[in-house]
Amino acid sequence: MEIDYLDKALDDIEFWKKTGDKVIQKRISKLLESISKTPYSGIGKPEPLKHQLSGYWSRRITEEHRIVYTVSSDRIKIISLRFHYT
C-alpha cells in the first residue's frame, strides 16, 4: 500500500534524523514497512484509537513515542511520529 505523510509527520521524520538516534530511525523504518504490508497487525502493538481519534491507529516506536496513522482502501496516511497521539 502507498504511504502518504502529513507535514507534521515529515517534520517528525526530520526531527528523528537530526537526533542521530540510529536505533529509533531503524525502528521507524521497520514499523513503516510493517504498516505498509499489514496495517492492522504486526510489530509495534498496533491498536485502534478511541474517542476524538476514532478511525486512527497507533504503533509504539518507544515507550514515549508513537506512529499515528489512518488507513483507506489503497493508502496509508502517516499523521505523526512523535509523542502520544498529538
Residue ranges with predicted function:
Residues E2-D4, K8-K26, K30, L49-K50, ...:
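Enriched for short, Lys/Arg-rich terminal
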Residues K30-G55:
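Generic amphipathic, hydrophobic interface segment in small proteins and small subunits
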